[in-house]
A protein has these predicted regions:
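Outer-membrane beta-barrel transmembrane strands
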Residues: 1, 5-49, 73-123, 159-191
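Predominantly extracellular beta-rich ligand-binding scaffolds that present long acidic/polar faces
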Residues: 57
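Flexible glycine-rich, low-complexity coil/linker segments exposed to the extracellular/periplasmic environment
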Residues: 61-75, 120-171
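Intrinsic disorder/low-structure terminal segments
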Residues: 138-140, 189-192
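Short, small-residue-rich loop/turn micro-motifs
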Residues: 196-198
């Protein structure tokens, strides 16, 4: 038995990434500074019409593959789209704080990210159970372009049946946040660094 599968598809992708950043001094002596960052990214992929054709054949009287009579066993069409959105932001503070005769450095910051994803698939198959034996014998050996033509599509002939498994589709989101604070103290020839992360 001879069997092969042919796929014809078009795939489109789009991606975008953008950022805005800033650095600011909060005083004239430039002892305190603030840095911030805002970002957005987008990714999108679509397959608007993937066509999957399965061909089969039984062995002929000879053993030469060229003698095989090949027919189309099934035709499926698959549509899918996937989109991602990511929003992010962060802010960092750094300042010099006098503690008696010691100048300590204080740092702190926050970061957050929000991500969403949406995946939508749809799957269809061409059903030919309504065809008579003679019509089916003719239909299955047509070029696949003709099998999908409107001449064959009707309620009492070939019809398109949706076989989408809804469990494969999903929507998801994720929120992430973190922060930190730290202090650096010079102690003679050494620096003492202490901090906390959340």
């Amino acid at each position: 038995t001879y069997r092969e599968e042919t796929e014809m598809l078009y795939q489109s992708r789009l991606s975008y990434l953008g950022q805005l950043t800033g650095n600011h001094f909060l005083d004239e002596k430039k002892l305190h500074s603030l840095a911030w960052n805002m970002g957005y990214s987008y990714a999108y992929r679509i397959e608007p019409d993937r066509r999957i054709v399965v061909n089969q054949a039984g062995m002929s009287d000879g053993v030469d593959v060229s003698q095989l009579k090949v027919g189309n066993e099934s035709i499926k069409r698959y549509f899918q789209s996937l989109s991602d959105h990511v929003f992010s932001g962060s802010v960092d503070y750094k300042g010099t704080v006098p503690m008696g005769e010691i100048l300590s450095t204080v740092k702190g910051g926050l970061i957050s990210e929000y991500r969403t994803r949406n995946y939508t698939p749809r799957e269809f198959i061409y059903r030919y159970e309504n065809l008579s034996l003679e019509e089916r014998a003719s239909y299955l050996y047509l070029p696949y372009e003709e099998m999908m033509s409107e001449d064959w599509l009707s309620v009492d002939k070939v019809f398109i049946d949706e076989i989408t498994d809804k469990k494969n589709a999903y929507e998801a989101y994720n929120i992430y946040g973190a922060g930190y604070g730290a202090m650096e103290l010079p102690m003679g020839k050494f620096n003492v660094y202490a901090g906390l992360r959340l």
